Amino acid sequence: MSEDWEPAAFKTRTDTVLAGFLDEEATALLAVDETLDPLAEALRSTARHGKRLRAAFCYWGWRAAGQPDSDALMRAAAAMELVHAAAVVHDDLIDDSPLRHGRPTAHHAFAALPHPRTTAHDAFAAPPHPRRRPRAAARALALLLGDHLMALAGRLYAESGLPAAYLSRGRPLWAALARELIAGEALEILHTGGLPDTGTSLKVIRYKTAKYTVEQPLLLGALLAGAPTALREGLSRYGLPLGEAFQLRDDLLGLYGDPARTGKAPLDDLRTGRPTVLLAETWRAADPAQRELLRRTLAGHGPHDEPHGPGEDALREVRALMAELGAPARVERMIAGRVEEAVRTLDELDLPGTAHRALTDLAHRAAVRHH
Protein backbone atom coordinates (compact mmCIF):
# COMPACT_ATOMS: atom_id res chain seq x y z
CA MET A 1 0.00 0.00 0.00
CA SER A 2 1.23 3.52 -0.81
CA GLU A 3 2.66 5.57 2.06
CA ASP A 4 0.09 8.22 1.16
CA TRP A 5 -3.49 7.96 2.42
CA GLU A 6 -5.68 6.75 -0.44
CA PRO A 7 -9.23 6.19 0.89
CA ALA A 8 -10.56 4.38 -2.19
CA ALA A 9 -7.60 1.99 -2.28
CA PHE A 10 -7.94 1.34 1.45
CA LYS A 11 -11.63 0.54 1.10
CA THR A 12 -10.90 -1.87 -1.75
CA ARG A 13 -8.23 -3.57 0.31
CA THR A 14 -10.56 -3.93 3.30
CA ASP A 15 -13.41 -5.17 1.11
CA THR A 16 -11.11 -7.82 -0.36
CA VAL A 17 -10.17 -9.11 3.11
CA LEU A 18 -13.82 -9.25 4.17
CA ALA A 19 -15.04 -10.82 0.93
CA GLY A 20 -12.57 -13.69 1.14
CA PHE A 21 -13.16 -14.33 4.83
CA LEU A 22 -16.96 -14.17 4.63
CA ASP A 23 -17.14 -16.26 1.47
CA GLU A 24 -15.24 -19.03 3.26
CA GLU A 25 -17.68 -18.83 6.16
CA ALA A 26 -20.69 -18.81 3.84
CA THR A 27 -19.37 -21.90 2.08
CA ALA A 28 -18.92 -23.63 5.44
CA LEU A 29 -22.52 -22.83 6.37
CA LEU A 30 -23.81 -24.27 3.10
CA ALA A 31 -21.84 -27.44 3.76
CA VAL A 32 -24.04 -27.91 6.84
CA ASP A 33 -27.27 -27.56 4.86
CA GLU A 34 -28.24 -25.80 1.64
CA THR A 35 -31.31 -24.39 3.38
CA LEU A 36 -28.92 -21.97 5.11
CA ASP A 37 -28.40 -20.10 1.83
CA PRO A 38 -30.23 -16.94 3.04
CA LEU A 39 -27.88 -16.68 6.02
CA ALA A 40 -24.86 -17.37 3.81
CA GLU A 41 -25.90 -14.66 1.36
CA ALA A 42 -26.46 -12.20 4.21
CA LEU A 43 -22.88 -12.84 5.35
CA ARG A 44 -21.53 -12.25 1.86
CA SER A 45 -23.45 -8.98 1.52
CA THR A 46 -21.60 -7.61 4.55
CA ALA A 47 -18.49 -7.26 2.39
CA ARG A 48 -20.28 -5.09 -0.18
CA HIS A 49 -21.24 -2.01 1.80
CA GLY A 50 -19.72 0.55 4.14
CA LYS A 51 -17.21 3.38 4.26
CA ARG A 52 -14.68 1.25 6.22
CA LEU A 53 -13.92 4.08 8.63
CA ARG A 54 -13.48 1.75 11.59
CA ALA A 55 -10.87 -0.32 9.79
CA ALA A 56 -9.14 2.89 8.72
CA PHE A 57 -8.95 4.24 12.26
CA CYS A 58 -7.50 0.93 13.48
CA TYR A 59 -4.93 0.96 10.68
CA TRP A 60 -3.86 4.53 11.39
CA GLY A 61 -3.68 3.88 15.12
CA TRP A 62 -1.04 1.29 14.20
CA ARG A 63 0.75 3.63 11.81
CA ALA A 64 0.58 6.51 14.31
CA ALA A 65 2.85 4.42 16.56
CA GLY A 66 5.42 4.24 13.77
CA GLN A 67 4.66 0.74 12.52
CA PRO A 68 4.86 -0.04 8.78
CA ASP A 69 2.07 -1.25 6.52
CA SER A 70 1.05 -4.83 7.30
CA ASP A 71 -1.33 -7.30 5.67
CA ALA A 72 -1.84 -9.02 9.03
CA LEU A 73 -2.79 -5.71 10.62
CA MET A 74 -5.26 -5.13 7.77
CA ARG A 75 -7.03 -8.35 8.73
CA ALA A 76 -7.19 -7.31 12.38
CA ALA A 77 -8.49 -3.89 11.31
CA ALA A 78 -11.13 -5.47 9.08
CA ALA A 79 -12.48 -7.23 12.17
CA MET A 80 -13.71 -3.81 13.31
CA GLU A 81 -16.02 -3.77 10.29
CA LEU A 82 -17.59 -7.04 11.39
CA VAL A 83 -18.23 -5.55 14.84
CA HIS A 84 -20.01 -2.72 13.06
CA ALA A 85 -21.94 -5.10 10.82
CA ALA A 86 -23.16 -7.01 13.89
CA ALA A 87 -24.17 -3.79 15.64
CA VAL A 88 -26.05 -2.60 12.55
CA VAL A 89 -28.06 -5.83 12.24
CA HIS A 90 -29.06 -5.68 15.90
CA ASP A 91 -29.76 -1.93 15.83
CA ASP A 92 -31.97 -2.23 12.74
CA LEU A 93 -33.78 -5.10 14.43
CA ILE A 94 -34.38 -3.11 17.62
CA ASP A 95 -35.61 -0.05 15.68
CA ASP A 96 -37.43 -2.12 13.03
CA SER A 97 -35.68 -0.03 10.37
CA PRO A 98 -36.63 -1.07 6.83
CA LEU A 99 -33.60 0.24 4.89
CA ARG A 100 -29.82 0.35 5.17
CA HIS A 101 -27.54 1.37 2.27
CA GLY A 102 -30.69 1.64 0.17
CA ARG A 103 -31.42 -2.05 0.61
CA PRO A 104 -33.75 -3.96 2.94
CA THR A 105 -32.31 -4.48 6.40
CA ALA A 106 -31.54 -8.06 7.42
CA HIS A 107 -34.82 -8.83 9.18
CA HIS A 108 -36.86 -7.26 6.37
CA ALA A 109 -34.90 -9.22 3.77
CA PHE A 110 -35.46 -12.45 5.69
CA ALA A 111 -39.17 -11.65 5.96
CA ALA A 112 -39.37 -11.42 2.17
CA LEU A 113 -38.20 -15.03 1.77
CA PRO A 114 -40.82 -17.56 0.61
CA HIS A 115 -42.45 -19.08 3.67
CA PRO A 116 -42.37 -22.89 3.92
CA ARG A 117 -45.66 -24.44 2.91
CA THR A 118 -47.92 -25.82 5.59
CA THR A 119 -47.80 -29.60 5.62
CA ALA A 120 -50.86 -31.81 5.77
CA HIS A 121 -49.89 -32.70 9.34
CA ASP A 122 -49.81 -29.00 10.27
CA ALA A 123 -53.14 -28.28 8.64
CA PHE A 124 -55.03 -31.10 10.28
CA ALA A 125 -53.34 -31.34 13.66
CA ALA A 126 -55.67 -31.08 16.65
CA PRO A 127 -54.93 -28.72 18.21
CA PRO A 128 -53.37 -26.97 15.22
CA HIS A 129 -49.60 -27.36 15.05
CA PRO A 130 -48.02 -24.08 16.22
CA ARG A 131 -46.17 -22.33 13.39
CA ARG A 132 -43.99 -19.27 13.82
CA ARG A 133 -45.18 -16.20 12.02
CA PRO A 134 -42.88 -15.09 9.16
CA ARG A 135 -42.08 -11.82 10.97
CA ALA A 136 -40.99 -13.64 14.13
CA ALA A 137 -38.87 -16.08 12.15
CA ALA A 138 -37.25 -13.25 10.18
CA ARG A 139 -36.39 -11.37 13.35
CA ALA A 140 -34.92 -14.54 14.87
CA LEU A 141 -32.72 -15.08 11.81
CA ALA A 142 -31.48 -11.50 11.96
CA LEU A 143 -30.65 -11.90 15.65
CA LEU A 144 -28.61 -15.01 14.84
CA LEU A 145 -26.89 -13.21 11.94
CA GLY A 146 -25.80 -10.37 14.21
CA ASP A 147 -24.52 -12.78 16.84
CA HIS A 148 -22.61 -14.71 14.20
CA LEU A 149 -21.00 -11.56 12.79
CA MET A 150 -19.77 -10.55 16.24
CA ALA A 151 -18.27 -14.00 16.76
CA LEU A 152 -16.63 -13.80 13.33
CA ALA A 153 -15.09 -10.44 14.24
CA GLY A 154 -13.26 -12.10 17.11
CA ARG A 155 -12.16 -14.96 14.89
CA LEU A 156 -10.81 -12.68 12.15
CA TYR A 157 -8.84 -10.75 14.77
CA ALA A 158 -7.45 -13.93 16.34
CA GLU A 159 -6.52 -15.38 12.95
CA SER A 160 -5.13 -12.14 11.51
CA GLY A 161 -1.56 -13.42 11.43
CA LEU A 162 -0.18 -10.93 13.95
CA PRO A 163 2.05 -12.41 16.68
CA ALA A 164 0.20 -13.76 19.70
CA ALA A 165 2.02 -11.28 21.95
CA TYR A 166 0.63 -8.41 19.88
CA LEU A 167 -2.91 -9.79 19.90
CA SER A 168 -2.89 -10.23 23.67
CA ARG A 169 -2.38 -6.47 24.08
CA GLY A 170 -5.76 -5.85 22.51
CA ARG A 171 -7.84 -8.37 24.44
CA PRO A 172 -8.83 -6.05 27.33
CA LEU A 173 -9.99 -3.47 24.81
CA TRP A 174 -12.15 -6.08 23.04
CA ALA A 175 -13.88 -6.78 26.35
CA ALA A 176 -14.46 -3.07 26.98
CA LEU A 177 -15.72 -2.56 23.43
CA ALA A 178 -18.36 -5.28 23.77
CA ARG A 179 -19.47 -4.07 27.21
CA GLU A 180 -19.75 -0.42 26.19
CA LEU A 181 -21.47 -1.13 22.88
CA ILE A 182 -24.15 -3.17 24.66
CA ALA A 183 -24.40 -0.52 27.40
CA GLY A 184 -24.95 2.21 24.82
CA GLU A 185 -27.65 0.28 23.00
CA ALA A 186 -29.35 -0.54 26.31
CA LEU A 187 -29.19 3.09 27.43
CA GLU A 188 -30.89 4.17 24.21
CA ILE A 189 -33.69 1.64 24.72
CA LEU A 190 -34.16 2.64 28.36
CA HIS A 191 -34.27 6.37 27.57
CA THR A 192 -36.52 6.10 24.50
CA GLY A 193 -39.80 7.78 25.33
CA GLY A 194 -38.34 9.53 28.37
CA LEU A 195 -37.88 13.25 28.96
CA PRO A 196 -35.43 14.51 26.30
CA ASP A 197 -32.11 15.67 27.75
CA THR A 198 -29.01 16.70 25.80
CA GLY A 199 -26.53 15.33 28.34
CA THR A 200 -28.26 11.96 28.40
CA SER A 201 -28.38 11.82 24.60
CA LEU A 202 -24.67 12.63 24.33
CA LYS A 203 -23.89 9.82 26.78
CA VAL A 204 -25.95 7.41 24.67
CA ILE A 205 -24.12 8.27 21.45
CA ARG A 206 -20.74 8.13 23.18
CA TYR A 207 -21.25 4.53 24.28
CA LYS A 208 -23.48 3.28 21.48
CA THR A 209 -21.48 4.66 18.54
CA ALA A 210 -18.67 7.12 19.21
CA LYS A 211 -16.30 4.83 21.07
CA TYR A 212 -16.47 1.80 18.77
CA THR A 213 -16.45 3.95 15.63
CA VAL A 214 -13.31 6.01 16.26
CA GLU A 215 -11.65 5.80 19.67
CA GLN A 216 -11.57 2.04 20.21
CA PRO A 217 -10.40 1.10 16.68
CA LEU A 218 -7.64 3.72 17.02
CA LEU A 219 -6.62 2.38 20.41
CA LEU A 220 -6.70 -1.20 19.16
CA GLY A 221 -4.28 -0.33 16.37
CA ALA A 222 -2.07 1.57 18.79
CA LEU A 223 -2.11 -1.26 21.34
CA LEU A 224 -1.21 -3.81 18.69
CA ALA A 225 1.70 -1.58 17.72
CA GLY A 226 2.92 -1.29 21.31
CA ALA A 227 2.25 2.46 21.50
CA PRO A 228 3.20 4.25 24.73
CA THR A 229 0.54 5.43 27.15
CA ALA A 230 0.96 9.11 26.22
CA LEU A 231 0.18 8.42 22.56
CA ARG A 232 -2.82 6.26 23.42
CA GLU A 233 -4.20 8.98 25.68
CA GLY A 234 -3.74 11.51 22.90
CA LEU A 235 -5.55 9.28 20.42
CA SER A 236 -8.44 9.02 22.89
CA ARG A 237 -8.62 12.82 23.08
CA TYR A 238 -8.88 12.85 19.29
CA GLY A 239 -11.21 9.88 18.96
CA LEU A 240 -13.96 10.59 21.48
CA PRO A 241 -15.06 14.03 20.24
CA LEU A 242 -14.72 12.89 16.64
CA GLY A 243 -16.85 9.81 17.29
CA GLU A 244 -19.53 12.03 18.80
CA ALA A 245 -19.35 14.33 15.77
CA PHE A 246 -19.80 11.31 13.52
CA GLN A 247 -23.03 10.26 15.24
CA LEU A 248 -24.35 13.82 15.47
CA ARG A 249 -23.88 14.07 11.71
CA ASP A 250 -25.63 10.73 11.28
CA ASP A 251 -28.62 11.99 13.26
CA LEU A 252 -28.84 15.12 11.10
CA LEU A 253 -28.63 13.08 7.91
CA GLY A 254 -31.31 10.73 9.19
CA LEU A 255 -33.81 13.59 9.31
CA TYR A 256 -32.58 16.11 6.77
CA GLY A 257 -30.40 14.10 4.39
CA ASP A 258 -31.36 12.87 0.94
CA PRO A 259 -32.61 9.26 1.31
CA ALA A 260 -31.19 8.49 -2.14
CA ARG A 261 -27.73 9.24 -0.71
CA THR A 262 -28.11 8.09 2.89
CA GLY A 263 -29.78 4.81 1.90
CA LYS A 264 -31.95 5.02 5.02
CA ALA A 265 -35.66 5.56 5.54
CA PRO A 266 -36.36 9.20 6.44
CA LEU A 267 -38.07 10.01 9.74
CA ASP A 268 -37.05 6.67 11.32
CA ASP A 269 -35.49 8.34 14.36
CA LEU A 270 -38.69 10.29 15.01
CA ARG A 271 -40.92 7.32 14.35
CA THR A 272 -39.12 5.25 16.99
CA GLY A 273 -38.74 8.15 19.43
CA ARG A 274 -34.97 7.69 19.74
CA PRO A 275 -33.37 10.02 22.34
CA THR A 276 -31.27 12.01 19.88
CA VAL A 277 -29.51 15.28 20.63
CA LEU A 278 -31.69 16.86 17.94
CA LEU A 279 -34.81 15.91 19.86
CA ALA A 280 -33.32 17.05 23.18
CA GLU A 281 -32.28 20.42 21.77
CA THR A 282 -35.74 20.88 20.27
CA TRP A 283 -37.37 20.07 23.60
CA ARG A 284 -35.08 22.49 25.44
CA ALA A 285 -36.09 25.38 23.16
CA ALA A 286 -39.79 24.51 22.86
CA ASP A 287 -42.59 26.40 24.57
CA PRO A 288 -45.37 24.50 26.42
CA ALA A 289 -47.59 24.21 23.32
CA GLN A 290 -44.70 22.92 21.23
CA ARG A 291 -43.75 20.43 23.92
CA GLU A 292 -47.31 19.16 23.91
CA LEU A 293 -47.01 18.58 20.15
CA LEU A 294 -43.82 16.60 20.74
CA ARG A 295 -45.45 14.54 23.50
CA ARG A 296 -48.56 13.83 21.46
CA THR A 297 -46.63 12.81 18.37
CA LEU A 298 -43.78 10.82 19.85
CA ALA A 299 -44.87 9.37 23.20
CA GLY A 300 -45.36 5.61 23.22
CA HIS A 301 -44.50 5.15 19.57
CA GLY A 302 -41.45 2.91 19.71
CA PRO A 303 -41.23 0.25 16.98
CA HIS A 304 -42.92 -2.44 19.06
CA ASP A 305 -45.27 -0.40 21.27
CA GLU A 306 -48.23 -0.03 18.92
CA PRO A 307 -49.14 -1.40 15.50
CA HIS A 308 -49.71 2.10 14.13
CA GLY A 309 -47.28 4.85 15.05
CA PRO A 310 -47.53 8.54 14.23
CA GLY A 311 -48.37 9.38 10.63
CA GLU A 312 -45.97 10.88 8.11
CA ASP A 313 -47.63 14.33 8.32
CA ALA A 314 -47.23 14.45 12.10
CA LEU A 315 -43.57 13.41 11.87
CA ARG A 316 -42.89 16.04 9.22
CA GLU A 317 -44.49 18.63 11.50
CA VAL A 318 -42.06 17.68 14.26
CA ARG A 319 -39.13 17.83 11.83
CA ALA A 320 -40.22 21.31 10.75
CA LEU A 321 -40.48 22.35 14.41
CA MET A 322 -36.91 21.20 14.99
CA ALA A 323 -35.70 23.47 12.20
CA GLU A 324 -37.88 26.36 13.39
CA LEU A 325 -36.36 26.17 16.88
CA GLY A 326 -32.80 26.05 15.53
CA ALA A 327 -31.93 22.55 16.76
CA PRO A 328 -30.12 21.48 13.55
CA ALA A 329 -27.98 24.63 13.63
CA ARG A 330 -26.99 23.98 17.24
CA VAL A 331 -26.08 20.39 16.41
CA GLU A 332 -23.98 21.66 13.48
CA ARG A 333 -22.07 23.85 15.93
CA MET A 334 -21.55 20.85 18.21
CA ILE A 335 -20.12 18.92 15.26
CA ALA A 336 -17.80 21.75 14.23
CA GLY A 337 -16.52 22.19 17.78
CA ARG A 338 -15.79 18.50 18.18
CA VAL A 339 -13.98 18.24 14.84
CA GLU A 340 -11.91 21.29 15.75
CA GLU A 341 -11.03 19.71 19.10
CA ALA A 342 -10.00 16.45 17.42
CA VAL A 343 -7.81 18.13 14.79
CA ARG A 344 -6.22 20.41 17.40
CA THR A 345 -5.30 17.33 19.42
CA LEU A 346 -3.47 15.85 16.42
CA ASP A 347 -1.28 18.95 16.27
CA GLU A 348 -0.26 18.33 19.89
CA LEU A 349 0.88 14.75 19.22
CA ASP A 350 4.22 13.62 17.85
CA LEU A 351 2.93 11.66 14.85
CA PRO A 352 4.53 10.53 11.60
CA GLY A 353 3.54 12.93 8.83
CA THR A 354 1.54 10.32 6.92
CA ALA A 355 -0.48 9.43 10.03
CA HIS A 356 -1.15 13.09 10.84
CA ARG A 357 -2.40 13.77 7.32
CA ALA A 358 -4.53 10.62 7.21
CA LEU A 359 -6.15 11.23 10.60
CA THR A 360 -6.85 14.86 9.68
CA ASP A 361 -8.55 13.75 6.48
CA LEU A 362 -10.49 11.03 8.31
CA ALA A 363 -11.77 13.60 10.80
CA HIS A 364 -13.39 15.56 8.00
CA ARG A 365 -14.63 12.44 6.20
CA ALA A 366 -16.31 11.19 9.36
CA ALA A 367 -18.08 14.42 10.25
CA VAL A 368 -18.53 16.35 7.00
CA ARG A 369 -20.44 14.00 4.71
CA HIS A 370 -23.73 13.46 2.91
CA HIS A 371 -24.29 9.74 3.63
Report residues per predicted region.
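Conserved N-terminal diphosphate/IPP-binding helix and adjacent helical/loop segment
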Residues: 1-85, 89-131, 135, 186-197, ...
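A short glycine-threonine-serine/GTX helix/turn-capping micro-motif
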Residues: 138-143, 199-209
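Acidic, Mg2+-coordinating active-site segments of isoprenoid diphosphate-utilizing enzymes
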Residues: 64, 89-130, 154, 181-198, ...
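Short hairpin/turn module used for nucleic-acid contact or packing/dimerization
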Residues: 316-371
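Transmembrane helix-loop-helix
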Residues: 157-174, 294-296
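A glycine/threonine-rich phosphate-anchoring loop and its flanking beta-alpha core
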Residues: 133-162
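Residue-level signal for inorganic ion chemistry
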Residues: 57, 153, 279, 342, ...
